[in-house]
UniProtKB/Swiss-Prot annotation:
Biological process (GO), any one: mRNA pseudouridine synthesis
Any Pfam family matching the protein: TruB_N
Known function: Responsible for synthesis of pseudouridine from uracil-55 in the psi GC loop of transfer RNAs.
InterPro entries linked: PsdUridine_synth_cat_dom_sf, PsdUridine_synth_N, tRNA_psdUridine_synth_TruB, TruB_C
Catalytic activity reported: uridine(55) in tRNA = pseudouridine(55) in tRNA
Record has Iron as a keyword: no
Active site: D39
Annotated PANTHER family: PSEUDOURIDYLATE SYNTHASE TRUB1 (PTHR13767:SF2), TRNA-PSEUDOURIDINE SYNTHASE (PTHR13767)
Gene: truB
GO MF annotation terms: RNA binding; tRNA pseudouridine(55) synthase activity
Family: Belongs to the pseudouridine synthase TruB family. Type 1 subfamily.
EC assignment: 5.4.99.25
Name of the molecule in the record: tRNA pseudouridine synthase B
Length: 309
């Protein structure tokens, strides 16, 4: 049985849900969940939680993402990427200055609001935006708070008839639409634009070179080694502070007990989470400050019961 995170190199042409369904069949288990949607046209790092690790999906999803992207200026599209219909056109007749591009990218660093594209899975009034878009209905989209942690130009500008393209890398908070970011970059440079290529190169500290293709995963299943290649739950939670406890306290944590906040976590905020682990590194629960009882910790998520060990 696999209890960990499989690092999938998602191929182009599959939805994230397609990937989950394929792994469910491959591993013959329903306990599979992905950690952040990638559009079908996008490839790259897609962590897949399996077994007990499905309980930590939200914590893995919270991590920052890094992408290598290509933007093409000269025309915009209905989907903000290369798959949509042309919406507006403005030929690029003058060379773009690298200094201007870098200035725009620097300007975009930091916290900001972003309006998700109409062709997206964001829900408004219980329906996904792409359902409205396919029906030709434009609806008001709620702004989302995002953070661009880092963004940098990674290629020279190339020109092709009436368009110009360049590549950039961006590290951003969850929920950021890089294709919308590409449109914003184009606007700031004075041109309609769209995202012409995208690959996710990292999700938190999981990098592309750690990922496996479906073919490799199938071979691991055949060899009986797939569990060995899964990222353990404790490593998947290494962005959370860890509280190491005795086996006696671990048993209480597995039963959902409330604890006094340890001195080293006395300054933790209401939205903070800590991973509670045994001395041998097994994470048994995720704890949070008690909302109504000051000075106490309560379980936000119990990851393991004794019956599962």
């Amino acid at each position: 049985m696999v209890n960990g995170v499989l690092l999938l190199h998602k191929p182009v042409g599959m939805t994230s849900h397609d990937c989950v369904m394929k792994i469910r069949k491959l591993l013959k288990t329903k306990k599979v969940g992905h950690t952040g949607t990638l559009d079908p046209e996008v490839s790259g790092v897609l962590p897949i939680c399996v077994g007990r690790a499905t309980k930590i999906v939200e914590y893995v999803t919270d991590k920052s993402k890094t992408y290598d992207a290509e933007i093409t200026l000269g025309f915009s599209t209905s989907t903000e990427d290369q798959t949509g219909e042309t919406v507006s056109v403005k030929p690029v007749k003058e060379p773009l200055k690298e200094a201007d591009i870098k200035a725009v990218l620097d300007e975009l660093k930091g916290p900001q609001e972003q309006v998700p594209p109409m062709y997206s899975a964001v829900k408004v009034n219980g329906k996904k935006l792409y359902e409205y878009a396919r029906a030709g209905i434009e609806v008001e989209r709620p702004k989302r708070n995002i953070t661009i942690e880092d963004i940098a130009l990674t290629s020279p500008v190339t020109y092709n008839e009436d368009t110009a393209s360049f590549r950039f890398t961006v590290t951003c908070s969850k929920g950021t639409y890089v294709r919308t970011l590409a449109v914003t970059i184009g606007e700031k440079l004075g041109y309609p634009a769209h995202m012409s290529h995208l690959i996710r190169t990292a999700s938190g500290d999981f990098s592309l070179d750690e990922c496996f293709t479906f073919e490799e995963l199938e071979q691991q299943v055949s060899d009986g080694t797939v569990a060995e290649h899964a990222v353990p739950i404790d490593r998947a939670l290494n962005h959370l502070p860890k509280w190491v406890i005795s086996d006696t306290l671990a048993k209480k944590a597995e039963n959902g007990s409330v604890f006094d906040i340890p001195a080293e976590f006395s300054a933790m905020t209401a939205d903070a989470r800590i991973a509670v682990c045994t001395e041998d590194g097994e994470c048994v629960a995720i704890y949070m400050p008690h909302p109504s009882k000051k000075g106490l910790l309560k379980p936000a998520k119990v990851l393991m019961q004794k019956s599962e060990q």
